[in-house]
Amino acid sequence: PVTRIEKTAGGWALTTPSGIVETRYIINAAGISAQAVHDMAAPHKFTIQPTRGEYYLLDKSEGSRVHHVIFQCPNENGKGVLVAPTVHGNLIVGPNADPVEGDDTACTAAGLAFVSAAARRSVPNIRFSESIRNFAGVRANVDTGDFVIGEAEGAPGFIDLAGMKSPGLSSAPAVAREAVKILEAHGDLPAPKADYRDGRTRVRFKELPPEEKARLIA
């Protein structure tokens, strides 16, 4: 983890347990730690409350209960409990919104009971006995009410991308373009690599033969 950030003549110096890293720019996309990282480099601007959301993933036998995402009215903590079909034919239900300390992704009986009761207000006949998986994630609930995107006041070259909650994944490409615009305004970005090729292999586990699935799991 980063333990200290200092401004230098050429940009920034970040102290870590592995040593000091020097860079011209910092993009603060540290999730629930973004407030702590920001406060090392610039005056305090926002507060993040880590908020756990718990989910049910139900068997495909429940996947046809709904044919599009069913939202309830959101509140100050987030989007509320939704019921949605997945691309693989399952049904996903959740989340709740419980303030936690740090990255606490434990599922709780109370949290899952809240999720199931809230979901039944939208879709009364869900069979939660068909649950095949429960999981939880922690989102960065920020007190500004919206994403924090921009160069920090009094800290040129330090860019916050913080407070990303429920739509963060969907908006990631647009957020990245905003970050690039800020960097371009400084006028010294390297040119894009014209010959860049994404060579990463994409494994579609569902489509693999049984022996290949077993090899990857082992």
Where do the protein language model's features map onto the residues?
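A conserved beta-strand/loop element that lines the FAD pocket in flavoprotein oxidoreductases
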Residues: 1-2
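C-terminal catalytic lobe of FAD-dependent flavoproteins
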Residues: 78-80, 87-88, 99, 103-217
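Flavin-dependent oxidoreductases
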Residues: 5-94, 98-108, 117, 123-126, ...
